[in-house]
Amino acid sequence: MPLPAPAPTGSDRTDADPALPPLTLPDLTLRVAGRPLATLRGLTLRPGEVLHLHGPNGVGKTTLLRVLAGEQPGGDGVRVAGYTPGSLPARAATAWVPTDAPLPDDLSAGEFLHFTAALWSRPVAPLLTLAGALGLNRWLDVWPQELSRGTRQKVALSAALGLELPLTLLDEPFGTLDADSRAALLDAMQRRAAAGGALVVTTHGSELTPLRPRTLTLDPA
């Protein structure tokens, strides 16, 4: 799934402390199979801030997002809402959409949105509202394998942003979208930031300019 594992419940649950920043990055060298890939300067991302990851192709932007999502090691000292990436409380605070987000084959697009909201104990209305803004209403009863890559991406983006979690990670979210959908996505990101959510986004274009993002440049190691 493009989203993190279900939020822990009961005695296993440790909610993110709203007083802690959504993301704390130390000075870091990203490595793949032990090979240095990129270096970056540390920063603290506060609620409501948008961070644009910048750098040439292959420098490690997607690798960094995977580290932040807890899918890949290499983030010594990184903290998500005060916790180590991949830990239960960090995953409970993070939504993540890669460039080609997989969806479960046994749920229609609409069922996936309802299932995701229920799994996270969140209202489904924000997910469905964003889906409508992205032009998905006619596709909600369709199986993912029958959807185009761009439409699947819209479903994943609707789920991730609709959950309204403290930290949202988006890898090239505009790449497969038409102009109207890009505008709707930008509006959703702007509203998420205005509500206190932090976003980390990779994009090769200038789509994020209206959000006045901070920029983190990854330099080849």
What are these regions (language model features)?
Residues A69:
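Helix-to-loop junction immediately C-terminal to a conserved catalytic motif
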Residues D100, D105-S121:
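Q-loop/switch helix immediately C-terminal to the Walker
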Residues L157:
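Hydrophobic anchor residue at the start of the ABC signature
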Residues H54-P56:
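The feature captures the beta-strand-to-loop junction immediately N-terminal to the Walker
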Residues P73-A92:
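Conserved ABC transporter NBD signature motif
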Residues H114, V124-L140:
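Conserved ABC ATPase "signature" region
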Residues W143-G150:
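Conserved ABC ATPase signature
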